[in-house]
């Protein structure tokens, strides 16, 4: 639900009030509580918890299939994270020497939404310090694509996304004569 959320505060952390008034929320944010929103949020959390295991399994399978297809086409493709320890909904891949910004444009024209670099450096106009810190070269950072999988993804659209990524990377390799 809109206008409701959860803030988990570590013991020992002191927060300052940002809205003053009636003293609701332990004096940290006064105003009438959105009871219906809170109940809706609690229900959403319960549903997410019940579905989490199956969703993790589903997303892991989709990500593994996508990686398998891409690796088959590009054995030199770099995966920038430990596939066993990273979030199953997240994938950062790199095609050294390819301009990932051009890939983003080509893929968006086909309905595949991806981003470049790391989320920590998004829209900063500089190379990702996160990818540099894990040892990627400038060419690998410049060729990095970030993909996020979610509840709307399925076998069919992940397969098509993989095909479009392969086409786009091949087109860029041909353009740059690699």
PLM regions and their residue ranges:
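PLP-dependent enzyme catalytic core of the Aspartate aminotransferase-like
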Residues: 122, 126-178
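Thr-Gly-centered strand-to-loop micro-motif
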Residues: 2, 28, 81, 93-94, ...
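A glycine- and small/hydrophobic-rich beta-loop-beta segment
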Residues: 74-76
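Active-site PLP attachment segment
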Residues: 1-26, 30-43
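Conserved C-terminal alpha-helix-loop-beta "cap" of PLP-dependent enzymes
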Residues: 89-145
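A general structural signal for well-ordered alpha-helical segments in protein cores
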Residues: 1, 35-38, 45, 63, ...
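Structural signature of PLP-dependent enzymes
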Residues: 45-68, 78-87, 99
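Short beta-strand-to-loop capping motifs
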Residues: 9, 93-97, 149-151
């Amino acid at each position: 639900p809109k206008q409701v959320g959860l803030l988990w505060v570590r013991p020992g952390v002191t927060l300052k009030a940002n809205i003053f008034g009636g003293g609701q929320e332990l004096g940290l944010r006064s105003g009438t509580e959105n009871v219906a929103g809170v109940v809706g949020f609690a229900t959403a959390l319960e549903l997410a918890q019940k579905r989490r295991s199956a969703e993790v399994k589903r997303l892991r399978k989709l990500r593994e299939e996508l990686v398998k297809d891409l690796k088959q086409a590009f054995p030199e493709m770099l995966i920038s994270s430990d596939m066993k320890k990273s979030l199953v909904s997240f994938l950062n891949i790199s095609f050294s020497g390819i301009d990932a910004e051009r890939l983003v444009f080509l893929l968006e024209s086909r309905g595949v939404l991806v981003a470049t670099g790391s989320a920590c450096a998004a829209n900063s106009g500089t190379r990702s310090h996160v990818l540099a810190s894990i040892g990627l070269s400038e060419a690998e950072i410049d060729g990095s694509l970030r993909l996020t999988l979610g509840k709307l993804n399925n076998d069919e659209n992940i397969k098509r996304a993989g095909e479009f990524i392969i086409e786009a990377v091949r087109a860029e390799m041909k353009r740059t004569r690699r």
